[in-house]
A protein has these predicted regions:
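Short, basic, helix/turn surface patches
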Residues: 109-121, 158-164, 211, 215-230
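Catalytic subdomain that performs nucleotidyl-dependent activation
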Residues: 56, 137-216
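Short, solvent-exposed polar/charged micro-motifs at secondary-structure junctions
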Residues: 95-98, 203-204, 234-235
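Residue-level detector of flexible, active-site-proximal loop/helix-junction positions
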Residues: 63-65, 91-93, 159-162, 175, ...
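ATP-dependent adenylation/nucleotidyltransferase module used to activate substrates
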Residues: 1-142, 148-151, 178-186
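A short, charged, Gly/Pro-tolerant segment at domain boundaries
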Residues: 220-247
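Solvent-exposed amphipathic alpha-helical surface segments
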Residues: 17, 46, 50, 214-217, ...
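Generic structural signal for well-ordered, non-membrane alpha-helical segments
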Residues: 3, 110, 200-203, 207, ...
Length: 247
């Protein structure tokens, strides 16, 4: 995917759901993966021509695993003129301890990681956090909710975090994972290998393969599934209805 196409899709999401307002200070949660680096690239570029000014900082939560080198990410942030910070934690070890009787520590890890990111973002005066969830993530979350919770749900474009004053935005919501992979390859993004021993062995990975198979057998099914989520009256989505749709 070319840079201008990425800008176009991200700009559409920002505008459709009023994700950015004047003088926002936005923290990008950077994991070193292709998704967060693509989001970093997109928002840092859009910042130069967006109609309202906003600030960016990039924050990586180090889970405490060995051999996790974020220096290439630091170099990219320097190139893009984005401040970069690393939060050192023992979340990897803590998650394993707390989940001894569970299939995997992923839910604990996600909860603790988000908490660390939120706290650090607040300490730097940020009022918003940009997550790098793309269209496929939104669809996969819907399937996870259906299969394992019996509910039709997926996370929304904009989410207000009660009590913290933080707002979560998802600017990659119109970008498919295949486009993210294409952008990563075209621009040689410095992806860091995920050191987590559970990487690729989760329910989400199972659902990812399921959606991929469905789309192979029924071309275009992902776009139809995404449309169903947009139009499905999910509570969190109704709360952030596009401004153009309000009366």
């Amino acid at each position: 995917m070319k840079l201008q196409k990425l800008y176009s899709k991200v700009r559409q999401a920002l505008d459709d759901y009023n994700m950015i307002t004047e003088n926002d200070k936005i923290a990008i949660g950077v994991s070193g993966g292709k998704d967060s680096l693509t989001l970093l690239y997109a928002l840092s570029g859009i910042r130069s021509f967006y109609p309202v000014p906003f600030e960016l900082v990039a924050i990586a939560v180090d889970l405490g695993y060995e051999d996790f080198d974020l220096s290439p990410v630091k170099a990219l942030c320097d190139e893009l003129s984005v401040e970069f910070y690393v939060v050192k934690t023992d979340i990897g070890r803590i998650s394993l301890e707390k989940s001894k009787n569970q299939a995997s520590p992923c839910s604990w890890c996600a909860k603790l990681r988000k908490g660390a990111l939120n706290d650090f973002a607040l300490s730097f005066g940020c009022n918003k956090i940009a997550y790098a969830h793309h269209m496929d993530d939104i669809i996969e979350t819907m399937f996870l909710s259906l299969l394992y919770e019996g509910q039709f749900y997926s996370f929304a474009p904009v989410t207000q975090l009660d009590g913290s004053g933080l707002t979560i935005i998802r600017p990659l919501m119109y970008v498919g994972e295949s486009d993210v992979k294409g952008f990563k390859n075209k621009y040689n993004l410095p992806v860091c290998k995920n050191p987590c021993p559970y990487d690729g062995h989760t329910r989400r990975e199972y659902v990812k393969q399921l959606v991929r198979q469905l789309n192979m057998e029924n071309p275009g099914v992902k776009k139809r599934l995404f449309s169903a989520i947009q139009n499905g009256n999910i509570d969190d989505w109704v709360k952030c209805t596009k401004p153009s749709d309000t009366s």
